[in-house]
C-alpha cells in the first residue's frame, strides 16, 4: 500500500516552494518524463515516468491541490524499482487541478506537471459483446456490437478498435474511429475461413487527450468453408485392374485442425466417409462423383461436385511437351487441345517416388495451352506431369510425361544380357532401362561397346528407342560387352559387363565325315554278323560242346560242381517193349522176294575216336 502523508509547511516555506514549482511547471497535456491522468470521471489517479538510473533509492511523489486546498501537499512513497504509482480517489477532489512533482534523495527529479482532472483523464475500456455476426457472401465479414464506458452522457467519447489473428502478434487498427453518440457496430472484412480472431477497443475524451487502456480481447472463430480446389490423384481411369486413386484437396487454413465429410456416388449409390482428416480420401472403385464438406457444417449444399467419369481419349489434350525454362526455377509445359474445348485444364505434377497425397496442381482457363509450373524444382530429379481436360461430364487425361528442371549426366548404365542366337552362331543381346532417379534426364541414345583380347574396343551408338542389338561378323574367341546411356548433359558410366565366348565350329565340321564313315562301317559289320549268325550257330554249338568244358557253356556255369572231368554220357530214351495189341483179322498176302542190299564197307577206326566218341554200349544200342 502506498504511504500517503500530508506535509504541513509555514507560510514562508510554502510561498518559496510554490514559487520554485511555478517557475518550472509544465503545462498539462505536454509530453514529459512524468505523465499523470485519471481513469474515468470517478476513477483513480495514475502517474508514470521513465525508469530512473538509481533503482535502489525509491522516489517520492508530491501532489498539491490548485483549486480547492492550495495549502495541502500530499506525499506518496513509491516502492523501489517501480516507475509508476496510483493515487487513490479519496486523496483528491473531482474536477480539481493538481500540481505534481517528484524527488529522490531530496533532489527534484522532473519539472512539476499540472493535471486538470476535468479533462486530463482516460476513459475506461469499452464493452464488447460476445455475439458476433458473420456474413458468408463473397468474402467473410464479422460485425461486433459494443457499448461505451461509463461517462457523463452529455460528453461524447472517441473510440478506436483493432483486431488480429489469435496466433499473430501484430494488430490491425480499424478505420474510421467511432463515436459514442451513434454506437455504430464494429465491422471486420476480408477474414479467412476457419480462423480464430481477437478484437479489442479503447476510448479517449477528445483529440489530443490521452487514450484509455485497450479492453480485454474478445475471441471468435470464422466458420470453415467448403474446399473449392478438389482434385484426384492417381490412375482414376485405369482399366487394367491396377486402379489406385486418391481424392485430394487444398487445406484452406493449414494451422487449423478440422475434419471433413466426403461423399462418393455412382448412379443411385452414395458412400459417405466421416471424420476424414485433411486433405485426402481413397476413391472407391467405379465411383462417378465426389463432394467434400467440413465435418461441422450444419447444412450440406454440394459445394464442389468433382466428376470422376472418364471420357474418350480423343477428348484429352495431345502432344504434351516438357522443357526447362531459361532463367526460371519452374518447368514449362505445353499441349494441344483435343477434339473439343473443355471447361478448364488441370496440370498436376509430383516428384518420382512420392506418394499419391504429395501432389501439386494448378487450374488454367480453356484458352491456355501452356503454363510455367510454380515451385522449386531440383535439377536431375524426374517429375511426373499430367495434363487433364475437365468437362461438365467428366475428365480426359493425357498420358503422363516425365520432366526435368535440369538434365544431368546419368549415374549408372543399363544391365545387358544375351538372347538366343538369330541366326545360329550370331549373338543377340538386350539391355534394360536405367531407373529414372539414376538416369537424371531424357535418354538421347545408347552406346554398346565390345572388347576382345588383343584388339581395340569397338563402340556403336543406337537409338534410345532400341534395346536389342545383333552382333554379326564376330571372330572366334571371348569378348566383353557393356552398354552406356546418354542424356543432353553427357554420357553416363558403363553398366555391368557381359562375357561372350564364340567357339571354333570348323573343327566340328571337319570331323563330321570321318564320324559318319565310322558309323557306316559299324552298321555294316553289325548287319553281316547278324546274317552269318544263323549259319554258324549249329556248328559253333557243336564245337563249343566238344572243345570247351561244360561249366563254360552251361547257362549258369558252376566250376565247383561241374562234371566236366567225367566221361561224357548222353542220356537217351530206350525203346519200350512192345505190348500186346488188339486181335485183328489177318489176311494172307503174297510176299515179295527180298533183295539184299550191298554190304556197306566197315568203318575205319583210327583209335583217336575213342577219346571223344561214345561206344555202342554207352549209347545203349546193344543188349
UniProtKB/Swiss-Prot annotation:
PROSITE patterns: FN3. A motif (WSXWS motif) lies at residues 211-215. Keywords: Glycoprotein, Membrane, Receptor, Repeat, Signal, Transmembrane, Transmembrane helix. Glycans are attached at residues 46, 296, 305, 360, 368, 461. One of its GO terms (molecular function) is interleukin-27 receptor activity. GO terms for cellular component: cytoplasm; extracellular region; plasma membrane. The chain crosses the membrane at residues 511-531. It is found in: Membrane. Gene3D superfamilies: Immunoglobulins. GO terms for biological process: defense response to Gram-positive bacterium; negative regulation of cellular extravasation; negative regulation of interleukin-17 production; negative regulation of interleukin-6 production; negative regulation of neuron apoptotic process; negative regulation of T cell extravasation; negative regulation of T-helper 17 type immune response; negative regulation of tumor necrosis factor production. Residues 30-124, 125-225, 316-412, 413-505 form the Fibronectin type-III domain. InterPro entries: FN3_dom (IPR003961), FN3_sf (IPR036116), Ig-like_fold (IPR013783), Type1_Cytokine_Rcpt_Type2 (IPR052672). Residues 25-510 are extracellular. It is a single-pass type I membrane protein. Induction: Down-regulated on differentiation of CD4+ T-cells in both Th1 and TH2 cells. Expressed in CD4+ and CD8+ T-cells, B-cells, natural killer cells and macrophages. Highest levels in CD4+ T-cells and natural killer cells. Expression highest in Th0 cells. Residues 1-24 form the signal peptide. Its main location: membrane. Belongs to the type I cytokine receptor family. Type 2 subfamily. This is Interleukin-27 receptor subunit alpha.
Amino acid at each position: 500500500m502506498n504511504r500517503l502523508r500530508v506535509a504541513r509547511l509555514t507560510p514562508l516555506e510554502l510561498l518559496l516552494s510554490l514559487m520554485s514549482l511555478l517557475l518550472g511547471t509544465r503545462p498539462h497535456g505536454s509530453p514529459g518524463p512524468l505523465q499523470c491522468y485519471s481513469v474515468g470521471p470517478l476513477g483513480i489517479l495514475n502517474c508514470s515516468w521513465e525508469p530512473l538510473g538509481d533503482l535502489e533509492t525509491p522516489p517520492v511523489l508530491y501532489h498539491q491541490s490548485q483549486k480547492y486546498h492550495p495549502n495541502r501537499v500530499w506525499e506518496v512513497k513509491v516502492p523501489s524499482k517501480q516507475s509508476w504509482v496510483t493515487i487513490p480517489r479519496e486523496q483528491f477532489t473531482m474536477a480539481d487541478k493538481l500540481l505534481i512533482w517528484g524527488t529522490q534523495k531530496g533532489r527534484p527529479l522532473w519539472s512539476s506537471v499540472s493535471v486538470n482532472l476535468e479533462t486530463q483523464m482516460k476513459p475506461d475500456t469499452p464493452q464488447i459483446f460476445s455475439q458476433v455476426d458473420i456474413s458468408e457472401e463473397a468474402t467473410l465479414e464479422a460485425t461486433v456490437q459494443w457499448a461505451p464506458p461509463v461517462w457523463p452522457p452529455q460528453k461524447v467519447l472517441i473510440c478506436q478498435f483493432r483486431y488480429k489473428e489469435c496466433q499473430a502478434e501484430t494488430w490491425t487498427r480499424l478505420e474510421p474511429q467511432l463515436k459514442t453518440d451513434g454506437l455504430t457496430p464494429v465491422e471486420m472484412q476480408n477474414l479467412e475461413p476457419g480462423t480464430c480472431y481477437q478484437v479489442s477497443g479503447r476510448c479517449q475524451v477528445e483529440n489530443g487527450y490521452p487514450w484509455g487502456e485497450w479492453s480485454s480481447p474478445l475471441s471468435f472463430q470464422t466458420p470453415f468453408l467448403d474446399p473449392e480446389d478438389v482434385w484426384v490423384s492417381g490412375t482414376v481411369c485405369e482399366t487394367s485392374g491396377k486402379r489406385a486413386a486418391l481424392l485430394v484437396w487444398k487445406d484452406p487454413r493449414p494451422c487449423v485442425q478440422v475434419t471433413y465429410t466426403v461423399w462418393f456416388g455412382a448412379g443411385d449409390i452414395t458412400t459417405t466417409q466421416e471424420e476424414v482428416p485433411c486433405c485426402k480420401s481413397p476413391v472407391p472403385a467405379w465411383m462417378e462423383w465426389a463432394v467434400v464438406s467440413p465435418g461441422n457444417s450444419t447444412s450440406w449444399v454440394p459445394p464442389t461436385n468433382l466428376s470422376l467419369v472418364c471420357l474418350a481419349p480423343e477428348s484429352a489434350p495431345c502432344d504434351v511437351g516438357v522443357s526447362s525454362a531459361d532463367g526460371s526455377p519452374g518447368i514449362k509445359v505445353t499441349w494441344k487441345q483435343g477434339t473439343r474445348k473443355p471447361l478448364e485444364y488441370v496440370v498436376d505434377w509430383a516428384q518420382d517416388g512420392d506418394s499419391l497425397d504429395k501432389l501439386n496442381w494448378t487450374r488454367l482457363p480453356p484458352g491456355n495451352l501452356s503454363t510455367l509450373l510454380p515451385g522449386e524444382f531440383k535439377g536431375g530429379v524426374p517429375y511426373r506431369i499430367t495434363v487433364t481436360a475437365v468437362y461438365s461430364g467428366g475428365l480426359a487425361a493425357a498420358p503422363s510425361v516425365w520432366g526435368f528442371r535440369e538434365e544431368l549426366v546419368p549415374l549408372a548404365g543399363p544391365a545387358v544380357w544375351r538372347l538366343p542366337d538369330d541366326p545360329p552362331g550370331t549373338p543377340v543381346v538386350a539391355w534394360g532401362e536405367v531407373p529414372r532417379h539414376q538416369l537424371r534426364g531424357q535418354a538421347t541414345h545408347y552406346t554398346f561397346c565390345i572388347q576382345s583380347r588383343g584388339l581395340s574396343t569397338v563402340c556403336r551408338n543406337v537409338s534410345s528407342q532400341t534395346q536389342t542389338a545383333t552382333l554379326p561378323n564376330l571372330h572366334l574367341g571371348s569378348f566383353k560387352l557393356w552398354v552406356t546411356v546418354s542424356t543432353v548433359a553427357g554420357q553416363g558410366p558403363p553398366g555391368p559387363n557381359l562375357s561372350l565366348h564364340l567357339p571354333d565350329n570348323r573343327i566340328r565340321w571337319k570331323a563330321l565325315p570321318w564320324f559318319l564313315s565310322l558309323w557306316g562301317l559299324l552298321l555294316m559289320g553289325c548287319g553281316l554278323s547278324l546274317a552269318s549268325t544263323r549259319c554258324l550257330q549249329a556248328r559253333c554249338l557243336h564245337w563249343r560242346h566238344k572243345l570247351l568244358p561244360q561249366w563254360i557253356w552251361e547257362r549258369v556255369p558252376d566250376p565247383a560242381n561241374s562234371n566236366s572231368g567225367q566221361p561224357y554220357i548222353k542220356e537217351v530214351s530206350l525203346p519200350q517193349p512192345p505190348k500186346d495189341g488188339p486181335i485183328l483179322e489177318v489176311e494172307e498176302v503174297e510176299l515179295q522176294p527180298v533183295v539184299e542190299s550191298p554190304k556197306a564197307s566197315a568203318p575205319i577206326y583210327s583209335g583217336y575216336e575213342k577219346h571223344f566218341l561214345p561206344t555202342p554200349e554207352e549209347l545203349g544200342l546193344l543188349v
